[in-house]
Amino acid sequence: MPSHSRSRDRYGGRDSDREARYDYDYARRRYATDDNDDDYDDDELEHGLNERRYRRDGYLPPRESRTRGYYERDAEGAADEELLGDERNPGPRASRSYGHDYDARRGERSRAREAPRRSERHRDRDREGQSRRRAYEDDGRHRTRDGRRERGRESDAEARRSRRREAGRETAARKHQSSDSTNSASHLLSADALARLGAQYEKEERRKRENAKDAAKAERKRQKKRAVVGEESRALRDPPGESHRDRTKARVASGAYLEEGRSPEMQVRHRGGGGPAMEARWRKEGSWGGTMDDAGGGRPFWKRKKWIGLGALILILVIVIPVAVVVSKKHDNKSDPADPQGTSPGKSNLDGLSHDSIPAYAQGTYLDPWTWYDTTDFNVTFTNETVGGLSIMGLNSTWDDSARPNDNVPPLNEPFPYGSQPIRGVNLGGWLSIEPFIVPSLFDSYSSVAGIIDEWTLSKRLGSSAARTLEKHYATFITEQDFADIRDAGLDHVRIQYSYWAVATYDDDPYVAKISWRYLLRAIEYCRKYGLRVKLDPHGIPGSQNGWNHSGREGVIGWLNGTDGELNRNRSLAVHDSVSKFFAQDRYKNIVTIYGLVNEPLMLSLSVEDVLDWTTEATKLVQKNGITAYVALHDGFLNLSKWKSMLKNRPDKMLLDTHQYTIFNTGQIGLNHTAKVNLICNDWYNMIKEINSTSTGWGPTICGEWSQADTDCAKYLNNVGRGTRWEGTFSLTDSTQYCPTADTGPPCSCANANADVSEYSADYKKFLQTYAEAQMSAFETGQGWFYWTWRTESAAQWSYRTAWKNGFMPAKAYAPSFKCGDAVPDFGNLPEYY
């Protein structure tokens, strides 16, 4: 609503006594808002509290409406340019709060400066123009006049006290001399007693006078040292109860405040508690710890209480911390199967060693164990020896290949009967090659605007902290306990992912170089300990072989493709040259039994001929370097029937690796529960059996990836920020739901699939286990399988570990409850929409 016209003549002589009333109101307000005043004032604070209540409710009485709050001045009373905008030039936010345009408001402010209103009710408007404020010199005259008035009042008070004392003495004397029974006690006081009473009275009066002087002195000192943030300067303050309508809440420059030691005021503003205003409120509510006659001279009770509480807290910490450390150490020495990661890395094998044992040129590098996040089970004796240009630092010089995972499998030092006994293995996805849906916690803290979608962007964003962050992940996400559990689950092979930056980085690569190599070597030693054989699988190749996030960099395919396609081709061969020389050592011949070339090259986009030529060259290279393991190549997402005629003149000991999922195929994800099991046992069973044959198909074939997930609901599964086919949010242009009840209802939801496993019904668990066991049965018609993946942070249907521990995976992988050919069980009342 527009303001009324502001005219001096409208109020006639109302200003004639304004100055006198201002002096009284100003002094009264000083008393009522004194920071250290312990009196129970009930005048202006109640108005302020009511006003704050109206503000919270979005309403202020029209006559008191204000659009601005804090207005701050420095200690000298000058406007602080860092804290305040020009009140005559409000910022965009302030201007938008008005109901009319800026030019109209500017004109109205001009009229206000020319003819300011003198109404008491609108005194805030009188102060809008800078020219309307009292000058500093005028305020000095007011202070002088205030001082004279204050001294006069003190003299009058002292005179009144003297008259009261004299009257008291005369009354006591008359009562003592009177014989009237109403003025007499049983025994009249003696002269000595009267003298003592008089002396006591005089002593009490002196104490009161001294307290009054001390209080006045303290008040003068407080007025001189009044804080800028706590209260405005007197020089430019508004009249009592008034403030400027056009003032916005000031921006607090925190740096300046902290430099001046005023951080407590910052806390008051941020949290809305404490400070002079709240202290006054506490006094009014009877919560103030001071006393009425302590005049603010002593430490308030609430401050003493704070220090008492702090002391008690310190005492508790002194007792609790040593106990917690002891308990923590005991816990660290016991692997917790439910959460084997622990809270701190182990470095006990550095005890008693000197950092000087590391040559100066190696200190601070990846060869320096004092820089490692975790040294558990690493050999920390320094060596700069390499094989194929790759460091052996961390390895022990001896090894033992006598272990076996179970009685159905030969020990490592005996050949595995590939072709007659299926592989039953698991992947370590998302560990040494980061994948967002497996470890979403590494990506959750970034907004979609930041574009952190893969290991490339994550490493680039982390910058200098990338090495520490990712090494912590390497050290804690997969530990020795995981390999023990893999063995106990009846598994016998592990497919370990790594990427080229474990070996080398190029150009502007932001990846953390070489650290994951050390954890790859330790993982192989853990596999050795538990009798598990290893398939090596490079998930990230220079340039990216598919443009997906698990290749390291989502986007363009730069391997065998584009401007740097040939360069990255040669780089990928150089990586295999180094890696194959390293794993051709005798210590790995019994354990690294399958050597992968590249994970999921997207042959639907790449030249098939170029990929096959590279595959042949890479296979010959690694075999020339001494690799005797089977060499695995991926089907490139081509129809398996096409592979019947491809690479017929290939090198020996090669395996075809196929990855099978129902959830990424819109024709399969919408099948109901029973139909999915039938699809596996009919179509997939025969497909794998056929391609695995050297006479009717390609030859030895493994399924390197599959899962029991029957939806694509897992967070980040379809890329960071992408929706799902199941709920119809995957495509930006198509909202079709691909689920069994999409046409009939109810609509499918990811809530049940993504729920905590403790909420899974018995029927749902039965389906998930049957669905998994059907796939095991189908893939075992070939060379066997590797489940994707062993562990995830939250995607339960992708974690063999979670399913195994929660009863929807067979207790032993080699002893399933269901096989293709068995009758598909009844899944009870399991709804089809999840």
Swiss-Prot record:
It comes from the Eukaryota. One of its GO terms (cellular component) is plasma membrane. Glycans are attached at N333, N379, N384, N396, N549, N561, N570, N639, N672, N692. Residues 1-306 are cytoplasmic. The active site is at E600 (proton donor), E705 (nucleophile). It catalyses: Successive hydrolysis of beta-D-glucose units from the non-reducing ends of (1->3)-beta-D-glucans, releasing alpha-glucose. It is found in: Cell membrane. This is Probable glucan 1,3-beta-glucosidase D. It comes from Neosartorya fischeri (strain ATCC 1020 / DSM 3700 / CBS 544.65 / FGSC A1164 / JCM 1740 / NRRL 181 / WB 181). The lineage of its organism: Eukaryota, Fungi, Dikarya, Ascomycota, Pezizomycotina. The gene is exgD.
